[in-house]
């Protein structure tokens, strides 16, 4: 057993040979390397599978033994300072390693088909291999310097993968935005690490925890300074895990290939921030103000992410805001001190969200044959619909992932989210109300995505759509850039959304709705049926087995992974697999809890949370189910006519919610106006001072000297005797002036 742990340090480096060899091969032997592309893919999957098996073995052993910490290499700078390189194996490391490798393997298998026609196929796999290596190095790190090194590598890999299609200006801007935003967080993290070293004199996790506990017990620490260091440490996870207000990079990161979106949102980039907060929780937990800040940032992100997802038309962007909201739940749990619930939700959400992203990639892949390869078309849910009969396997998998994220039992996210909601009730009633309300919003926007994508008919053939930019209704009045130029900002949302080519009418009109097969009215969209012509229509088809296989495996994970946190026996609440791994786990909310499971309380709380989820699903179903398929929706809409007195108020509310969501809460606009433009203005002023004033003074002295020399040259008549005469005259005058000044002092 000890022999096995001695080689744990090699975990991050097992997948590393493939990206290194690919990089060298593409530079020196590009043709031969490209001809062996399938072999490189197999090697990537094989090496990551070895890491997965190793991680599984370590996880099993973690149930029976304590944490393992060992330094492998040391760089001594002087007698008082040295850098250590080692590994720290504990249940958190084991769980994260399994999560990274399982999702990573499935994404690699998926990418083999998804990226097969891309010219950057091998470059993509090189980046992916390096990404997995960086994340594995991060979770096995034994000290903060090592963490920061791999933390930066994770950010670099995300920059490369988000901007993988760097020839597209949108993708290039997206990767720059992600890079710059994370620089802010990384700078704060670096300052926090240096401040913590100033206090404790060590970077090692175990030494940090022990030294700091002693300082606290002896009251030998400046509490304000440590609070500042703790906050700076938390700034890094705020940016990396897309927490408010440094979340702005996450939706733009969807410009990268779909497989990398799945990996970033499930097991790598955004999970890194949650991991670091969990790793440093023994430090944060002794500072109530930092714990409250963590929970506050988490609850704000929970609500903000859910509201921003309400009006997205891009399927990947909607899922991105969903990730942001779910990460907020995890951060909220960590801020409440519910360590186990946060990590449980990290696990269940990772597999559910990977399933949803790979499912969306399958949909996008099938839609590209119909609408083309532009993401503005292939990812646009407005052009989808009616895919149930065309992609039944993908539809079933996507539905399971959607239900899981909504918190429907017995799927994975139900168990973890229910724990967080229950803990929020113990922590703060206000936080509990927000968390529970957001659970309903989650169900609403997730089923909105599902219904727009799979229900009804294929909207591509029902839209007045052309591949060229036009002023047709395909701009949908609220979606296209072209329409934004001519949009009257005073328009109400509801009248605008239900307008057709000849007139504009309100969603809540005075006369009863009539059955019409030519118009489908939905909140936020209107789709016109212009009739079928004689041309042949093509429809999406199910993806290949290489794409479906990872989706089906993730489907199984989504169905059964929640079992690791369920106490199946009656011995106590800490007798499930997850609790055995995290024993003794940090949980401030259940220190005095009973040693048995109160199933009545569990069922009561579960019924409440599931009821909220079903209410959100019901609202989404009423608003987004195809109207022409049933008369029930018309009856529902006609009942709204009785609300004439509330019509204007209701329209204003919908208009506000839509504008808030579609414009990203105006946060991007705020940053652009008051931060980016201010920095650019300051840069312009600095440039003016540097070139006009600083350079002007220097150049002025030089020009003045030049003209004085020119004048002197003509006065001397180009004779040495004249130059000597003038020189001696000037020296004499200078000495006389100096003498008189000196004489006056006496």
UniProtKB/Swiss-Prot annotation:
It catalyses: a plastoquinone + NADH + (n+1) H(+)(in) = a plastoquinol + NAD(+) + n H(+)(out); a plastoquinone + NADPH + (n+1) H(+)(in) = a plastoquinol + NADP(+) + n H(+)(out). Keywords: Chloroplast, Membrane, NAD, NADP, Plastid, Plastoquinone, Quinone, Thylakoid, Translocase, Transmembrane, Transmembrane helix, Transport. PANTHER family: NADH-UBIQUINONE OXIDOREDUCTASE CHAIN 5. Belongs to the complex I subunit 5 family. One of its GO terms (molecular function) is NADH dehydrogenase (ubiquinone) activity. NDH is composed of at least 16 different subunits, 5 of which are encoded in the nucleus. It is an enzyme of class 7 (translocase). GO terms for biological process: ATP synthesis coupled electron transport; electron transport coupled proton transport. It is a multi-pass membrane protein. One of its GO terms (cellular component) is chloroplast thylakoid membrane. The chain crosses the membrane at residues 9-29, 39-59, 89-109, 125-145, 147-167, 185-205, 221-241, 258-278, 280-300, 327-347, 354-374, 396-416, 425-445, 547-567, 608-628, 723-743. It is found in: Plastid, Chloroplast thylakoid membrane. It comes from the Eukaryota. The keyword Translocase applies. Its EC number is 7.1.1.-. InterPro entries: NADH_UbQ_OxRdtase_chlpt_su5_C, NADHpl_OxRdtase_5_subgr, ND/Mrp_TM, NU5C-like, Proton_antipo_N. NDH shuttles electrons from NAD(P)H:plastoquinone, via FMN and iron-sulfur (Fe-S) centers, to quinones in the photosynthetic chain and possibly in a chloroplast respiratory chain. The immediate electron acceptor for the enzyme in this species is believed to be plastoquinone. Couples the redox reaction to proton translocation, and thus conserves the redox energy in a proton gradient. This is NAD(P)H-quinone oxidoreductase subunit 5, chloroplastic.
């Amino acid at each position: 057993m000890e022999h096995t742990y001695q080689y744990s340090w090699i975990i991050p480096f097992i997948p590393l040979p493939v990206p290194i060899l690919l990089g060298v091969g593409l530079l020196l032997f590009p043709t031969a390397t490209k001809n062996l592309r399938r072999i490189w893919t197999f090697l990537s999957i094989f090496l990551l599978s070895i890491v997965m098996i190793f991680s599984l073995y370590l996880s099993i052993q973690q149930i029976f033994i304590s944490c393992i910490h060992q330094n492998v290499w040391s760089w001594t700078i002087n007698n008082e300072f040295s850098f250590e390189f080692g590994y720290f194996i504990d249940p958190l490391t084991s769980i994260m390693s399994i999560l990274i490798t399982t999702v990573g393997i499935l994404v690699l298998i998926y990418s083999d088909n998804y990226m097969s026609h891309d010219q950057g196929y091998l470059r993509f796999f090189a980046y992916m291999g390096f990404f997995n290596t960086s994340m594995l190095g991060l979770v096995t790190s034994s000290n903060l310097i090592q963490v920061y090194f791999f933390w930066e590598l994770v950010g670099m890999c995300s920059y490369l993968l988000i901007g993988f299609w760097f020839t597209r200006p949108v993708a290039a801007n997206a990767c720059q935005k992600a890079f710059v935003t994370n620089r802010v967080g990384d700078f704060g993290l670096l300052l926090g690490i240096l401040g913590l070293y100033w206090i404790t004199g060590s970077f090692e996790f175990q030494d940090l925890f022990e030294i700091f506990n002693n300082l606290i017990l002896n009251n030998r620490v400046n509490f304000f300074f440590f609070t500042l260091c703790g906050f700076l440490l938390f700034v890094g996870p705020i940016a990396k895990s897309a927490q408010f207000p440094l979340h702005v990079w996450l939706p733009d990161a969807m410009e990268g290939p779909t497989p990398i979106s799945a990996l970033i949102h499930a097991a790598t980039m955004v999970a890194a921030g949650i991991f670091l907060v969990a790793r440093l929780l023994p430090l944060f937990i002794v500072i109530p103000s930092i714990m409250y800040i963590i929970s506050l940032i988490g609850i704000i992100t929970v609500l903000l992410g859910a509201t921003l997802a309400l009006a997205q038309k891009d399927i990947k962007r909607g899922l991105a805001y969903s990730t942001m909201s779910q990460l907020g739940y995890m951060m909220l749990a960590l801020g409440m001190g519910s360590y186990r619930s946060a990590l449980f939700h990290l696990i269940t959400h990772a597999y559910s969200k990977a399933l949803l992203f790979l499912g969306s990639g399958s949909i996008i892949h099938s839609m590209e044959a119909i609408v083309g390869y532009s993401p503005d078309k292939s990812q646009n849910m407005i052009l989808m619909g009616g895919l149930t009969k065309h992609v039944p396997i993908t539809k079933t998998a996507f539905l399971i992932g959607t239900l899981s994220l909504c918190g429907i039992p017995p799927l994975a996210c139900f168990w973890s989210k229910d724990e967080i909601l229950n803990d929020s009730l113990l922590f703060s009633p206000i936080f509990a109300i927000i968390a529970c309300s957001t659970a309903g919003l989650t169900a609403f926007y997730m089923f909105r995505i599902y219904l727009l994508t799979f229900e009804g008919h294929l909207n591509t053939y029902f839209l007045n759509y052309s591949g060229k930019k036009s002023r047709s209704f395909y701009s949908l009045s609220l979606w296209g850039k072209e329409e934004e130029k001519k949009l009257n900002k005073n328009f109400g949302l509801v009248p605008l959304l239900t307008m057709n080519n000849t007139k504009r009418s309100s969603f809540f009109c005075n006369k009863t709705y009539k059955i019409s097969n030519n118009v489908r009215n939905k909140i936020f969209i209107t789709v016109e049926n212009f009739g079928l012509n004689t041309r042949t229509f093509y429809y999406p088809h199910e993806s290949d087995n290489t794409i479906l296989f990872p989706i089906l495996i993730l489907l199984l994970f989504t169905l059964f992974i929640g079992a690791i946190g369920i106490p199946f026996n009656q011995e106590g609440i800490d007798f499930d697999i997850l609790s055995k791994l995290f024993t003794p786990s940090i949980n401030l909310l259940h220190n005095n809890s009973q040693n048995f499971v109160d199933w009545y309380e569990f069922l009561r709380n579960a019924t409440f949370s599931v009821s909220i989820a079903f209410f959100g699903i019901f609202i989404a179903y009423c608003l987004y189910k195809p109207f022409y398929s049933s008369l029930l929706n018309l009856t529902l809409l006609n009942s709204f006519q009785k609300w004439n007195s509330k019509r204007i108020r209701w329209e204003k509310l919908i208009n506000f919610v839509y504008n808030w969501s579609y414009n990203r809460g105006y946060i991007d606009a705020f940053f652009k106006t008051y931060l980016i433009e201010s920095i650019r203005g300051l840069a312009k002023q600095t440039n003016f001072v540097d070139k006009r004033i600083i350079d002007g003074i220097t150049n002025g002295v030089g020009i003045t000297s030049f003209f004085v020399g020119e004048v002197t040259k003509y006065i001397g008549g180009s004779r040495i005797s004249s130059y000597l005469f003038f020189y001696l005259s000037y020296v004499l005058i200078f000495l006389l002036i100096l003498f008189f000044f000196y004489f006056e002092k006496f």
